[in-house]
Structures are given as structure tokens and as C-alpha cells.
């Protein structure tokens, strides 16, 4: 198969990606048989586990960046109760370098801007080239950042959820 997989989930993803059901890969890539796989493979995930992996990756690959594609600041009870602050703090502790938004915009544009200006300033770049003001279509956020990785300049372009204006 050439190129990238189309948006597929569950059994369809496993079939197209040629991944056997019941394997560790199937557990990592799908929601299928989650209870059974959780019993077999034990606890996975969580920010403590993620922090360990990020530290290992950055130690073994100097110049590596941690990118966040969104869906991070919302979705849990604690995120709801703290208006996303618990997850924002976790992102900073993990060492996220560059982020774009998805469901973060459900917090409201003012809250998102507040986080970027207060919590992320000088620490995390927030990029979203496709989020524009409704009146004149001006960019709301930086569209991209240039980061040098092992001497090579690389552009990281932010592509937020394209239906943000009507979904949130």
C-alpha cells in the first residue's frame, strides 16, 4: 500500500493495515476488545507513562520536538472543573514544543488566547493557520513556526480542526 491510510477505525483499520486482531498493535490502534486487551497487556497510558517515553525519546534523539495535535485540554472531569488548566499544566510539564487546537476551542476563544498568552508564552508555540477572525478573515494565531532540528530549519504548520467556526 502506498501513501497514508484513509480515515478508518476498528476492524476496517486492522484489515487495511494488515494488523491481526488481538495483538498489541491492534490494542494500540483500535478500541476493539479493549477490556480483554487491557487484562492481557495491563495498564497503559497516562501522563506518567507518557512523560517517561518523552524523556527517553528526547534523550535518544537530540533536537526532537514534542508536537500536540489538540484534543488535550478537554474531555475529563478535571479538565471541565479547571477550565482546562490541569491539562495545560500537564502539557507544560511534558515539554510540549508546538501545539495546534481541536476541541480546545470549546473552552472559548478568549480562554484559548488566555492560555496561549499566559501559560504558553515563551514555552509552547500555538499555531493554527486556518483559524481566522469572522469579520475580516485575519489570522488569530501564528500560522507556523520554524524550528531548527539538528541544524536543519523545519517549518511546523498548524492546521486546527477545519470546522472550528461552526463546531464550537
What are these regions (language model features)?
Residues 1-168:
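Acidic, metal/ion-coordinating pockets
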Amino acid at each position: 500500500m502506498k501513501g497514508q491510510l484513509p480515515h478508518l477505525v476498528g476492524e476496517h483499520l486492522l484489515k487495511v493495515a494488515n494488523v491481526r486482531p488481538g495483538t498489541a498493535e491492534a490494542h494500540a490502534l483500535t478500541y476493539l476488545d479493549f477490556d480483554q486487551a487491557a487484562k492481557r497487556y495491563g495498564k497503559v497510558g497516562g501522563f506518567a507513562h507518557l512523560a517517561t517515553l518523552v524523556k527517553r525519546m528526547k534523550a535518544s534523539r537530540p533536537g526532537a520536538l514534542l508536537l500536540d495535535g489538540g484534543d488535550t485540554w478537554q474531555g475529563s472531569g478535571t479538565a471541565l472543573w479547571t477550565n482546562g488548566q490541569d491539562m495545560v499544566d500537564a502539557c507544560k510539564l511534558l515539554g510540549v514544543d508546538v501545539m495546534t487546537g481541536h476541541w480546545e476551542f470549546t473552552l472559548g476563544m478568549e480562554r484559548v488566547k488566555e492560555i496561549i498568552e499566559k501559560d504558553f508564552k515563551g514555552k509552547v508555540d500555538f499555531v493554527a493557520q486556518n483559524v481566522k477572525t469572522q469579520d475580516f478573515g485575519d489570522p488569530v494565531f501564528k500560522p507556523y513556526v520554524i524550528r531548527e532540528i539538528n541544524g536543519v530549519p523545519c517549518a511546523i504548520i498548524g492546521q486546527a480542526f477545519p470546522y472550528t467556526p461552526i463546531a464550537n
